[in-house]
């Protein structure tokens, strides 16, 4: 001890030397005050940890047993203490707030009132614990009225949380000023931690436990009690997922399973929406339910902003028709807009669909812990076991005390004359008490009960009542002792009581659970873009764009057309193709490279606009141009046919290009001086028809060609004269005819039967008579009677005509005028518009 004091004195001397600038400390040392030097880092660490644990345990996180934070528990206990229950009149909220602050929660009144308000909001709590009267806020984020205006009382369900609290079922601790006792936890006759969930941010941790359906939560507890080895999949058949007060649809089965298995996971909550038609045939998106904790007003304002900023197009009007009966928001869709696409955009860009992270963090034994679903159920079941046991012990003690009194009264009544004699002979109460105890071997309590007994109890009827009551109490005692000796009876009582709560207060599930995965609920670009028919247009200077198909109105054969592209003086239309916006667009260059992108990735432009430079979209080299393009929906095992300017043809499977990117890959190995001219898809192995610009063609069977790899250069299709080159390639489909068009706008249809199938390598036969009047062939394609043609000239004029208006003539004919070309203008390309199969459109 002397050695220790010596060390402290030495320490104080050192401290005095180091604190010459602190006269207060130096003075304390001189006065003999004990000063203990500490490291500031250690002190800050200890103080912060103390504060953190105070926040974690005493403020921000719920107790796993009753699902309540301290402030919620204090509010409910204060209201119960003052008997402000469901069978009593409403009480001013100000009075409740004052009671809680004055006796249990010495903090700001706003914190207490906000707690009250939340427990009364039907859109915040799955099962409200406070019955509020007045304005308690709204799903639009409106604040509740001041507490001087509102009134409240406990709900019947809240009373189930407090039931049996007077029977020593839970522990109590002193309040802040040691004037009252407050419960450390409530008896909780239902699993409130699951039913109403909890949200809170502590120091370094946070909890977000979703609410659940009361019936399902109760059934899950019962199932666990009856089968402690129950598996999580079995539990999830009973309790499939959260049940939010605002309804909606839960998406993310994997995330939900993960949350229940580990205590942490993520789901998505989607609004419940219908798409209906009004009397005018216009589509309306009707929102009935929104995700949990979403502010409806803010959500609608966000939608309005997206519409005003033209991020979402196609919405004409937004109406909020919500009332006391529920939510109803109508989003009116414009005539030509796609309601499903708009809805997908709303899901992606607004809180019509939200991500909800689950962290089931709660307090157990004064320590924070992340619970799995099964652990929560076990903790609650153990809590209820303790409550039932303590309640039974309390009732047993009370019954035993009552039996003890009744036994004394029975003895007195059986010896009433002697009792009266003893009492009359006694000088005072104490002597009478002692005499009775000595004569009949009674306890002090029994003697006092006899002395306090009224004379009316001496009637024969009252005597029998005492005897009957004693018998009933003895039966009760035996039953209570049996409960305490048999754990199975305790389990049975817990299950029975839970079942009664479920039967009295349970209701149907409001939130649907979708089997979609989280990945399937995320929206890719295609979900947000309408799958519409468009025209893909490419100019000589490699500017590309897409236009709505209805940009080009139908005209009679021989019309002048409409302006289809605004070009510079030296820029002209090169290629044209019809497509759907969700199609894949494969581009092939003269150098034999292939590029892949989606049609919707092309810029939308007007008829007059040039579009976007293709070099800004794909990786084209300076000496490289696109000579062919075609669209298709999906990669499959069908074949592509490629034809070069010098008459070589190559067959290759489409799925060889699945890894094609915008950077490009080799599609064909070209011979010196040759270029790739055209590419088509031939999924059904039809005969192939290849035509030259000088009007010669060859028809061959596809089986003559073997499939080759991407780097192969192909084989000879037809022998060409020096001044000739390939105009195009098409497939001979059933119920189709050959269509060809020449530079000066003459076109015709010819029956494929006029062309016999021959082997490759020949010079070909005439399919179009060419001359100065009609010019050389521009391109060929197979067409059906119901198809339409979109023809465009070098200057950008476009005409859309029906195939059936074009005459069927022989293979040596020149054809009829399809489009009237002006001086120095000529047909550059055409596209087939086929409603039934846009994928097969060729140019």
From Swiss-Prot:
In the record, what terms sit under GO molecular function?
ATP binding; DNA binding; DNA negative supercoiling activity
**GO cellular component terms, A-Z:** chromosome; cytoplasm; DNA topoisomerase type II (double strand cut, ATP-hydrolyzing) complex
Q: Which InterPro entries match?
A: GyrA, GyrA/parC_rep, Gyrase/topoIV_suA_C, Topo_IIA-like_dom_sf, Topo_IIA_A/C_ab, Topo_IIA_A_a_sf, Topo_IIA_dom_A, Type_II_DNA_Topoisomerases
Enzyme Commission no: 5.6.2.2
Name a single GO biological process. Answer: DNA-templated DNA replication
The yes or no answer to whether the keyword Hydrolase is present is no
Q: Which Pfam families match?
A: DNA_gyraseA_C, DNA_topoisoIV
Motif range for GyrA-box? 555-561
Q: What is this protein called?
A: DNA gyrase subunit A
Organism of origin is: Leptospira biflexa serovar Patoc (strain Patoc 1 / Ames)
